[in-house]
Amino acid sequence: TGGQSAVRSGLIDEITSNLKEEGLEYITLGGVIPNPLLSKVREGIELCQKEHVDFILAVGGGSVIDSSKAIGYGVANPNNDVWDFCLKKAVPTGCLPIGVILTIAASGSEMSSSSVITNEETKEKRGCAKTDYCRPKFAILNPRLTYTLPQYQTESGCVDILMHTMERYFVNIETMEITDSISEALMQTVIYNARILMKEPDNYSARAEIMWAGSLSHNGLTGCGTGGGDWACHQLEHELGGVYNVTHGAGLAAIWGSWARYVYEVNPERFAQFATNVFDIPCGTDYKETALAGIEAMENFFRSVEMPTSLHELGLDLTDQQIHDLAFKCSFEDTRTIGVFKQLNMRDMEKIYLMAR
């Protein structure tokens, strides 16, 4: 579990009571924080090995689920160090089965094969082995469990959901009409309901729409026929999260507009399609003009739900050297590129961070 909210709400007591009634033995591990830490994962692996755990129930949001996946990998692969899976030095051959009771709509980890862990010693935030071994066996989605979330966390979650589809949507290849249509409808649904939740945090219908959108946005559905997606914004944000511990969705909002303006000219028609089909912006013969209008519309949405559109608004006033260091880390010390819509090298990454400042 994460912090104390699931305890205060009585959810943990309800779960443990049900387990006892069914005669199921259990142990608990709490204290998972946003941008979940490798040290907590190692603690969980040691606990599971000591107590001979054979199933993990993740009660929380993305950080709790991602930690559970990494713990599951570590227990099922005792001859490997779990961080080696994040560094791609090793590949897991299994994972403890995982179930989810979701309390935060955001990451989509309840239906995904992804997990992200932060090494607090090296300030690195890395994906931990993308395999179907860690995909949860079941997930219980009750929108009422999200009523008590603070507004900032709710809206950060909505941005994360949007970005999981947008990262797959903005590719520079021929895509499938059905996938595009699903993606565009999902984005419209999230935008519409995120605005409702600003005024009505206990609106069940809006919470339900957002919660289901979160699962559909990251289970692979919106990536069919897109070649896997771009993911540059996530890579750029991972460095912000790893070094400065920012909220993931808010970090994505702060970066996205600068990334979009930096790359849109590679394929302005794709951005124009986004503008027209998501924001109903008329598309004339000038795709670039329509594309920029769509980028501005998305940034205006971020502002309308009080999400940042710059690093300064995110609470980061970074020096040129700090931005250079972020790009150096994101490029794995100038040894890799990121993105597929436009491949970005270290210099490109630095320019986007500077634009976002």
Where are these regions (language model features)?
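Active-site segments that bind and position negatively charged phosphate/pyrophosphate groups
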Residues: R168-A297
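Alpha-helix C-terminal capping segments
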Residues: K50, S68-A76, P92, G223-G225, ...
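Acidic-glycine-rich active-site phosphate/pyrophosphate-binding loop
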Residues: R42, R135-A139, G227-H234
